[in-house]
Amino acid sequence: MPWKYFDVMSMNSDQPLLKTTIKVDDIISLRSRSKVTRCVGVLILIAMVLWSVKVTIFEDTDWERMGSIGQVLTSAGRFMGIDFSLVPNLLVPAIETFMISCLGTLLGVIICVPATWFGARNITPFKPITYPIGRLLMSISRSIHEIVWALFFVAVLGLGALPGIFAIAVRSVGFIAKMSAEAIENVELGPADAIRATGANNFQVLLFAILPQVLPQVLGIILFEWEINIRRSAILGLVGAGGLGLVFFRQMNTFNHHGVTTVIIAILGIIMIGEVISHYTRNRVI
């Protein structure tokens, strides 16, 4: 049986027109290998999913302690109610939670200024040294969970809102600085070159040429992180960092199930208020 061929014409900017002959059987062979590779990949993925289900659901779950479906529903039913006597005592922790997120985000933005300056490739003052330092600060902030930061600051500063503020601030640096640095790296360099030609240093270039271009985008990043920080600040109280999370922890320890539900509703209310404020601010400023 004669071979079937395709004539493939290729053009290179540095070379004249070339003509290459490819066998049809070679194309079929390549496609078959690609299908085999995909099938093997799918089988590996299915095996990993089945193994994960086996380990997490069947081996690590205490089914005897969980009981029947009726017992599970009975346990869940204990939380169906509100402790109205607790409501007046939630105002101060709710305000504290809100202020932890605000002050933590503000402090994080302040810390982000040098981290962003160092971590943006096109404005970093001394690239071989400052650029790795800036990127390292971002990586450390993002790689450590806010609960771990809160535990660290509680151990250093004691219980209260202050450890929560510092934990929120340090955790915010990674996201805000990284996204801001990437926005700065994509700006038009014409205004920066013009200001630099007048003798301005890198910080002045950042302040007067770069920042006006990226300010709307940076404000959007900060508002987005602030929304997340409201959720974080509500949870940090579980490790003693103040706010509604601390009240939640106490209700759990005293087995006040209706109190737990009341605190959860308060947390949801704070989050929704934060979303409304963020949406309104974004529409007015950005």
Residue ranges and their predicted role:
Residues 2-106, 113-114, 118, 122, ...:
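N-terminal, non-cleaved signal-anchor transmembrane helix
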Residues 87, 91, 95, 126-133, ...:
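Alpha-helical membrane-protein architecture signal
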Residues 105-113, 117, 121, 147, ...:
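Hydrophobic positions within alpha-helical transmembrane segments of bacterial inner-membrane proteins
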Residues 115-150, 179-182:
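Cytoplasmic-entry segments and transmembrane alpha-helices of multi-pass inner-membrane transporters
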Residues 138-172:
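Generic hydrophobic transmembrane alpha-helix motif, especially the helices
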Residues 155, 229-267, 286:
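Glycine-rich helix-loop "coupling/hinge" segments at transmembrane-helix boundaries
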Residues 159-225, 276:
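Membrane-cytosol interface at the C-terminal ends of specific transmembrane alpha-helices
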Residues 220, 261-286:
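C-terminal transmembrane helix and the adjacent membrane-cytosol boundary/short C-terminal tail
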